[in-house]
Each structure stands twice: as C-alpha cells, then as structure tokens.
C-alpha cells in the first residue's frame, strides 16, 4: 500500500510539473511542425537506401563543416523489411551560440540540402533530425547519405512562453528553408 501511495504521489508531482510547460511546448512543436514538414526515406536494399520517397521541407545548411553520421540500415532477418538505424551525429547549439559537435564519418558543407525526418520539442531544447537529400561523396569515392541531429538549447522560459521568433531565428542561423512542400 505504501509503494502504491508513493507511486501516485510521484506521478502526480510529475504531471503537475509538466502542466505549465506542456501547453507552450505543444504550441512550439505545432508551429515548428507546420514549418518543417517531415520527409520519409526508403531503405529497400543496401544499394538504394536513403532515397527520399516523400519530400517535406527541404533545408539548406548555413554553415560549413557539420558532422553527419553515415546512413545505416538493418534487417532482423531476410524476410523482414530493412529499417533506418537512428544513428545521427549530434550537433548541439547552446543558448549563447556555443557549439558542441560529435565526431562523425561525414562532413557536410555550407549549402548542403537536408530533409527533416523528425522534430522533437523538449522543455529546454528543440531537436531536428535531418537526412541529406542527395548522397554525399566520401573520401574513397563512394557516396552515402548523412544523418545529423541538430539540438538547439533554449532557456526553458523561452519555450514555455512559446517565443517563436527567438526559436526560429536560432534555427535559421543554421538551417534555412530551401523549399517547402
């Protein structure tokens, strides 16, 4: 009985803490989801994996030297479909513009076109999961699609009050809209 009461108190506290930020986060998420339409990629086989089959918003990278993980797919067995392994290179853009990037197998240049595969809004950050629209040339002459997770950190109050111009301005410094579907 004691454990049940503790569980109820814990769940109630968690819900109470999230009520204030839940509405604003969903507002930010809704506005950004409307602005950054999600794309879908196809991974039927190893030779054609990463082809964009449903194009959403196309973004243009505004900076040079951004890391990207090489697209990886897996298959449980020979009869199951292939699926995308969510192995993104993470680039974190802090509140003051400080950048932290993980090393990765690909480097993307200014002007690289990207599509959005997913968008998440947390209490203190916006995460945009991207995929290169065209394959990127590797040093050995092969080409592969790249995957990068952009994490834009914000003061929780900025997202709680749904300050869309501030959020959009920070994202636009890195990712501009090339075309929207």
Each PLM stretch: what is its role?
Residues 1-2:
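N-terminal secretory signal peptides that target proteins for export/translocation
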């Amino acid at each position: 009985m004691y454990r049940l009461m503790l569980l109820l108190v814990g769940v109630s506290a968690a819900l109470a803490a999230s009520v204030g930020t839940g509405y604003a986060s969903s507002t930010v998420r809704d506005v950004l989801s409307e602005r950054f339409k999600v794309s879908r990629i196809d991974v039927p086989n190893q030779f054609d994996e990463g082809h964009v089959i449903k194009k959403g918003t196309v973004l243009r990278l505004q900076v040079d030297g951004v890391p990207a993980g090489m697209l990886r797919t897996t298959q449980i067995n020979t009869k199951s479909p292939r699926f995308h392994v969510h192995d993104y290179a993470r680039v974190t853009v802090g509140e003051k513009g400080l950048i932290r990037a993980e090393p990765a197998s690909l480097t993307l240049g200014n002007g690289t076109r990207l599509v959005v595969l997913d968008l998440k809004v947390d209490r203190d950050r916006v995460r945009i999961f991207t995929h290169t629209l065209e394959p990127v040339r590797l040093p050995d002459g092969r080409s592969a699609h790249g995957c990068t997770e952009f994490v834009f950190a914000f003061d929780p109050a900025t997202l709680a009050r749904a300050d869309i111009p501030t959020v959009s301005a920070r994202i636009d410094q890195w990712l501009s809209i090339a075309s929207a579907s």
